[in-house]
């Protein structure tokens, strides 16, 4: 990210945790994670009856979202973090690979909501887990304009969270 606070940047949107070190950081979206796959990928494999069946499919990996929390929540505490298969450093690339049928992505509902609504991705299991990091607004020097923008953006993000909750979150 560099020295953005030394230039004329008012706000930055990025992934943050609850204890962000800057003076003004607000979590905008408490996202949820769930496995998502292209219908074509699932049609090429045996039906997924239980979450354990996912382990037979290629699991798309990213260091930004480890599979272990979802696997534990699904009752697969003994399943190791996948260490083979495609690995991506960008959440958008991971989602794009899932859309191409390259594997199952552990995806943020906020990023995939349109693909889910259009049926281009499916959620094989209703289980979701909270994301460990959240989208947030960071401002080095708070200002009335930054706070007004944050309020407007938070209202939009609350609507997305409500949509995610009704879609299986």
Residue positions per predicted region:
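Hydrophobic residues within well-ordered alpha-helices
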Residues: 4-6, 54, 96-101, 116, ...
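C-terminal effector-binding regulatory domain of bacterial HTH transcription factors
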Residues: 109-118, 127-169
């Amino acid at each position: 990210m560099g020295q953005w606070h030394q230039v004329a940047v008012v706000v930055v949107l990025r992934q943050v945790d609850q204890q962000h070190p800057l003076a003004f950081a607000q979590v905008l979206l408490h996202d949820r994670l769930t496995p998502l796959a292209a219908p074509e990928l699932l049609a090429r494999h045996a039906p997924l009856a239980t979450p354990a069946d996912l382990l037979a499919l290629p699991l798309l990996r990213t260091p930004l979202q480890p599979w272990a929390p979802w696997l534990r929540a699904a009752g697969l505490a003994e399943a190791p973090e996948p260490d083979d298969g495609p690995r991506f450093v960008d959440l958008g690339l991971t989602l794009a690979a899932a859309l191409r049928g390259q594997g199952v992505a552990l995806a943020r509902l906020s990023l995939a909501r349109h693909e889910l609504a259009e049926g281009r991705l499916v959620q094989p299991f209703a289980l979701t887990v909270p994301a460990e990091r959240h989208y947030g607004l960071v401002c080095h020097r708070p200002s009335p304009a930054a706070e007004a923008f944050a309020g407007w953006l938070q209202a939009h993000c609350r609507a997305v969270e409500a949509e995610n909750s009704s879609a299986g979150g």
